[in-house]
Every structure is written in structure tokens, then in C-alpha cells.
Design a protein with these regions (language model features):
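Conserved PLP-enzyme active-site core in the AAT-like
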Residues: 2-6, 10-32, 41-361, 366-381, ...
């Protein structure tokens, strides 16, 4: 063993040599570096905890209010699978009333709500639905209608205002009595407000017209109303009137309304009976769900009235962005709480760089591409938060322009 090891050389007998002191120094250096990095991370975390974060990534980031937490703590509950949870029952009855539908069902998420709705209407595998090419169901719901339901999506181009041309919708309908090679159209889906188009609102007249087309061809109409309350406030039209033409609607409770979890789907009693069974199939049947529904009831009571202020702050934000050199936003398209803004061509900053810069100042937002960013207002963003964010963006853009001599 002594031939192979000494104080300074390992494996010397095998022709491999390593200076022990050098190795030990390297280990110490790596250890110190790791400690420094960990300390930097701890300092960053302390900053993020002590600093008030302005989170503009989505309206899904809101925290439960004190009144929500109190309602959750005191919620009357029961097993919602074995029988009915009384608080869930209250929420479902309230949502049915607000939307003018016969019945309602609480589900864990908007994605599940849309999936259940599509599957109820398209109960034959190989059915086809018509929906916007920029719709949430088509882009952001993991292709569930196809992978789980065997439903084929046929997209129609979304216009910038969130609509699809009526003529194109009707032309996309495929009659089962026609060509044998085509799937059978059974459903049309709309989204109101239309998130990817900047929170644009579909008018009553437009929705009614699509409803007429659906009835004419024996189809059903589903509305993804994740932000239907935002559309209602922006248009000055009651929710029940906005969705009158629809056979089913999904309404998100955790977006603009600010509840922590859940969505509600509404429709006829027979629709909801089928939806309840599908909810169980998909793993969405929960037990003492009233704890969550209690917060949603508070959201309906307290936060609907705050949506108009969210829309005003979004407009203020858009107008402020337009005053910053290097940015562009069409203020006239800002109808609800969503704002998309573009970094103009030729600017020396990318969206991801701007995101990182703002994060260092406690502002969180979501790039959509290398030159486009989305921000979403909600009731936990104040006017001063908007002004602070605009100031941070101005400083970031000014710094880049100075560095590049612009």
C-alpha cells in the first residue's frame, strides 16, 4: 500500500498523480463559492419577502382576502361526492341564477370545466368542434378534447377583436349527411372575454348570431367564460344576457374574481347531470369542497364591483406605456384587464431582458415572445403599483438607450 500512497501523491504506482494540497484547495474554493451563492440566494429571497411584489403575470396570482379566509374557516361542509356539500350547493345555485341557467356544477379548474362541457356535447368519439385558432381551449388546455375525448378541433381564425367571421363559422360546419370522409360537427365554442386577443369582449349581438347558426344546424354552443364577468362589466350587459344563446358556459372563479381555486359550469339540468358523472370520471369529484366554495361566494359578493377599477387601471397602464420611447400599445383595444405591449423594432432590449430587469425591482410580468409582453390587472394591484411599474420600465428602457447612444 505504501508503494501506491504517500502524503502528496495518490495512485503514484498506477502512473496517476495528483497533488493533494492542490486538490484540497480546489475543494475549499468550490465550497466557498457555493456558500457565497447560497448567501446571495438568501439575500435575494429576503428582498423578495420584504419587498412588495407587483405581480402582473395574470389575475390568477391573487391571494385570498381576509374575508375569504374567514369564510373558508367557518364554511359549512359535507361530502360532495356521497351527497351534496351545502356551501357548494349555495355557490352552484347562485351561479345558475346569475347566468340564467337551470343548474351549475363546481369543478377544480377551468380546463376541466371546458373539457367536461365539450365531452357532454360531443358524446360520440370522432365528433368535431369549431373554435377559434387563438382560443384558450385550443392552445392552453393540453389538447384534452382530443387526447381524452377523441374530439376533433376545427379552427377558424380569430379576428383581432376576438370574434370569428360568421360566414367562416358556417362554412366550417360539416354535415353528417355529406361526405363520408369528414367528422361530424356537433359544437361551436366561443371565448368571452378573449384572452389571447387582449381581453376583447364579444357583444350580445355577435353571440346571439352564432347561437342562431348553431341552432340552424342542430349544433350546441359552449362559451368559455373564464372572464365573462369582465366582459359583462366592460359591455354594461348582465352576465345572463351575454350567455343567453349558449347551451353551456364555464366561468372561472380564480381569475378576475380573485377566488383561490375553481370554476363553475352551467347549463340545463340534464347537461349538469351528465357533467357531474364526467367530473367524477376525470377525478374532479371532491369531498368537503365547501371550504373552496366559501371563498368563491365572497368573491362574487365583493370582487365583481372591483372589476371596473381593474379595467381603468389597465387603460391607465396602456396609456403610460405609450409614453415610453421604444414601446407600443394600441390603447383602443384595451377593453378589460389585459394589456399586450410590443417592444418596437430596432430597440436594443428584448422582452426577456426587460422581464429580468423588472424582477430585480419586484415587478413580475409575462413575455409572450421576444418582443411582446402581457400584463394582467387585478384587484390586488393599486394605482401606485401601476405608476411604480411604469417608472421601472421607463428606467430600464432609458438605461439601454443611454448604453447604446440612442
Amino acid at each position: 500500500m505504501s508503494d501506491h500512497y504517500d502524503n502528496n501523491n495518490w495512485f503514484s504506482g498506477s502512473g496517476l498523480s495528483c497533488d493533494f494540497s492542490l486538490l484540497f484547495s480546489s475543494v475549499l474554493l468550490c465550497s466557498r463559492k457555493e456558500e457565497e451563492e447560497e448567501e446571495q440566494l438568501r439575500q435575494f429571497r429576503r428582498k423578495m419577502v420584504t419587498r412588495t411584489t407587483v405581480d402582473l403575470r395574470s389575475d390568477t396570482v391573487t391571494k385570498p382576502t381576509e374575508s375569504m379566509r374567514a369564510a373558508m374557516a367557518n364554511a359549512e361542509v359535507d361530502d360532495d361526492v356521497l351527497t351534496y356539500d351545502p356551501t357548494a350547493f349555495r355557490l352552484e345555485a347562485e351561479m345558475a341564477k346569475i347566468t340564467g341557467k337551470e343548474a351549475a356544477l363546481f369543478v377544480p379548474s377551468g380546463t376541466m370545466g371546458n373539457l367536461i362541457s365539450v365531452l357532454v356535447h360531443c358524446d360520440v368519439r370522432g365528433s368535431e368542434i369549431i373554435l377559434g385558432d387563438n382560443s384558450h381551449i385550443h392552445i392552453y388546455e393540453n389538447g384534452g378534447i382530443s387526447t381524452i375525448g377523441g374530439v376533433h378541433p376545427r379552427t377558424v381564425k380569430n379576428n383581432p377583436d376576438g370574434t370569428m367571421d360568421i360566414d367562416l363559422i358556417e362554412a366550417a360546419i360539416r354535415d353528417p349527411r355529406g361526405e363520408l370522409v369528414y367528422p361530424t360537427t356537433r359544437l361551436i365554442c366561443l371565448e368571452n372575454s378573449q384572452a389571447n386577443c387582449g381581453g376583447r369582449c364579444l357583444s350580445v349581438e355577435y353571440t346571439d348570431r352564432v347561437g342562431e347558426i348553431a341552432k340552424k344546424h342542430g349544433l350546441k354552443l359552449h362559451i368559455d367564460g373564464a372572464r365573462i364577468f369582465n366582459a359583462s362589466v366592460a359591455l354594461g350587459v348582465p352576465v345572463h344576457r351575454l350567455v343567453e344563446a349558449a347551451d353551456s358556459v364555464s366561468v372561472c372563479l380564480s381569475k378576475g374574481l380573485g377566488a383561490p381555486v375553481g370554476s363553475v359550469i352551467v347549463g340545463s339540468k340534464s347537461f349538469i347531470n351528465k357533467a357531474r358523472r364526467l367530473r367524477k370520471t376525470l377525478g374532479g369529484g371532491m369531498r368537503q369542497v365547501g371550504i373552496l366554495c366559501a371563498a368563491a361566494l365572497v368573491a362574487l359578493q365583493e370582487n365583481v364591483a372591483k372589476l371596473e377599477a381593474d379595467h381603468k387601471k389597465a387603460k391607465m397602464f396602456a396609456e403610460g406605456l405609450n409614453q415610453i420611447k421604444g414601446l407600443k400599445v394600441d390603447v383602443n383595444t384595451v377593453e378589460t384587464n389585459i394589456v399586450y405591449f410590443d417592444i418596437v423594432e430596432g430597440s436594443k432590449i428584448k422582452a426577456e431582458t426587460l422581464r429580468k430587469n423588472l424582477e430585480e425591482h419586484g415587478v413580475l410580468l409575462m413575455p409572450e415572445s421576444s418582443s411582446r409582453i402581457r400584463i394582467v390587472l387585478h384587484h390586488q394591484i393599486s394605482t401606485s403599483d401601476v405608476q411604480y411599474t411604469l417608472s421601472c420600465i421607463q428606467q430600464a428602457l432609458t438605461g439601454v438607450q443611454v448604453e447604446n447612444g440612442i
